[in-house]
Amino acid sequence: LENIDSLFMAMTYNIPVQSVIFSGLRGVGKTVLINSLQKKAEEKNIFCKHIEVEERNDFISQIASCSQAFLRKISAKEKFKHLIQKPLEAIKSLVISFDPNDSTFSLSVQERELYKSSNLTQSLTDVFTTLGEAAYQSEIPICFFIDEIQYMKSAELGALIAALHRTNQLGYPIMIVGAGLPKIYAMLSEKKSYSERLFL
């Protein structure tokens, strides 16, 4: 826990850090742990959002909603409003392409075609890197707390790892604190060879 506290502290200095995944059987206190870590992060003025992945497969909807919440936070300050457009465009593309039932963005058929993407990894990477740039410039780091990661679709997990990897390469302060059943480690190692470097 001290290690994680030092990661949070590094983020407040705009230093990119590794993400953290906790695994264990049901009932061992993973959710309680990540909730307490979220409080610690919030005390350091890190922007935090909790996502509980469920079998109904709504990860894309939740990550988009959490990302928009970050943009609302920074838009409250006039000097940061110019940072919003790029991540908003990326979120729009992600939602229109991979969460078609979402009605957040009302666009014409022609506009929808402009935002349409068939590559989830690229779309989520665009969201994370543009969010990361806004986080860096506004000096408001971001931490997403994701519970029940094992319910993520394989393509979503692979896209999340790739997005985190690219964000980390660019030096942006975004991290994940996740929790899941023990099989999550096998799922991570199957997805990307560099996932072991991304997570503590």
Task: List the predicted regions and their residue ranges.
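The catalytic "switch" region of P-loop NTPases
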Residues: 140-200
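Phosphate/oxyanion-binding active-site loops and adjacent basic polyanion-contact surfaces
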Residues: 1, 120-124, 153-156
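Pre-Walker A adenine-sensing motif
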Residues: 2-13
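P-loop NTPase nucleotide-binding core
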Residues: 13-28, 32-142, 172-174
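Short acidic/polar alpha-helix capping motifs at helix-coil junctions
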Residues: 2-4, 126-130, 180-183
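Alpha-helical scaffold elements adjacent to nucleotide-binding pockets in ATP/GTP-utilizing enzyme cores
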Residues: 3, 36-40, 62-66, 159, ...
